[in-house]
């Protein structure tokens, strides 16, 4: 029997497919930025009408949730690197629409659908689903899945620092493999985190 719950579920799935396609098209980081704006927009809806639909359906839902759009951008980048279309799968910033490849964006759409379904599945797990951030865990799981499918395994031993004796030294950033050089040391990221947290606390 076709019920309203089924209709809402299918509508969400369709939205997630489009959201994943869009997230891959504009790039994961830009998609995540839009999620932030959608959160502000959702607060406006809540303040005016008391409705949380903006949070549940848009900002953290199938439209612009990070488990949909950001995760899709990451998966699309991993696939594009595997196909030799971009240099690094870590590039979650560049819009993938610039590649002109439909298959890359369809990967994003597929991971958008995966994020939607996996997040719902987590929420139905007794106790566990109500005591964790299912959206964050879905993002993590989606990214690991993309790595396993299109990366060189979960880890890349061939890229370890040669001569290192401990695991942490083997995977330590070097001149070839790094994320943000200006945020690698505690003296760099701790003051930044403290000041950003203090600023947010002052506004609150």
Identify what each model region corresponds to:
Residues 1-6, 50-62, 92, 117-136, ...:
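Membrane-helix interface and helix-disruption motif detector
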Residues 85-165:
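Membrane-interface helix-loop-helix junctions at boundaries between adjacent transmembrane segments
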Residues 15-21, 39-43, 71-78, 108-120, ...:
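Hydrophobic core segments of alpha-helical transmembrane domains in multi-pass membrane transport
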Residues 35-39, 50-92:
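Membrane helical hairpin/interfacial module
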Residues 26, 44-57, 79-86, 114-126, ...:
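Transmembrane helix-loop junctions in multi-pass membrane proteins
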Residues 1-63:
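N-terminal signal-anchor module of multipass membrane proteins
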Residues 98-103, 165-204:
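Membrane-water interface at loop-to-transmembrane-helix junctions
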